[in-house]
Amino acid sequence: MAFPSMLDLKARFAQGDSTRLDIITPNGRVLSSGDPDFQTQIRETLGVPVKLMEFPQVAETRLRSGRALHLVTTASLISMENLYPEGDFDPRRFRPNIVVNSPPGRNGFAEESWVGETIRIGPEATLRVEKTNRRCKVTTMKQDDLPYDGKILETISQKNGNVLGVMCSVVKGGIIAVGDELEPSPAEIDDLPHHSAPPRHLSQGSVGNRI
């Protein structure tokens, strides 16, 4: 990661104004994007030349990869914890857009079996699971209360071919929220060998955001 100090920052929408962003520094200082000096303040905080850019809610510009969303299941995180009990496989290490809460007792890397399939989240959002996600050393870095741990990536590499989670493209946009069910797209249900499995639910993710 070019700027590891960014992991120490937190972001939130300004209270009562979703058009402004607050950046919270490790010492608790709040930098507001509405402040005329914001760009200078964020550069001084990070010690590198950076610029905050605003995109409309529905962006006209597509991400070049076409695989804009990262999804991981709690089953995968629990499976990794079982392989390396001393490690903390907190979702923050892996920076997913969406965390799917797997049914109780379910383990293994469930989302890897969804590659090539179409899934629906909530009433309208539809994603295509494009590929598994190869991990890098950012997963080992210290951030907030998570310590540096090189064995996180070592375990993923040795036990699961250096992949954790999947990358998805958006087939149909929609609003998603914590608690939404994730299930096979209706057009594919009859063709999926595991369509009888109980639906999964979002436990974390792009809460109330359009994808």
What are these regions (language model features)?
Residues 1-211:
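Metal-cofactor-dependent catalytic cores
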